[in-house]
Amino acid sequence: MKLQSQALPSSDAFKANEAAHLKALETVREVAEAAALGGGDRSRARHESRGKMLPRERVANLLDPGSPFLEVGAVAAHGLYGGAAPCAGVIAGIGRVQGHEVMVVCNDATVKGGTYYPMTVKKHLR
């Protein structure tokens, strides 16, 4: 079965929509990239000075080497709490551990010492 579409890729409307979509997608990628840094340089340095692995390092060490990790909610809490809760303070996603697909939820202590915000709870429960 072939899906039919009325979209005309050569039309001005299509091109305008595509450009707007690509611009919005780039914004989401930039926000997700910034959020992946966690609580900022100072918090990360404090965490490392205590001999602790950073949250994304913990996730990487948990997962099977070379296996994919599909992060969900990477931009959760964006624009909330004065920017103090990147990723809502929790890294969540689907990965592979010993060959099994698993859901991973990792608290990010670099974000306000691991404080849970209302969006953290919402993301965690989702």
Where are these regions (language model features)?
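Terminal-region recognition feature
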Residues: 1-126
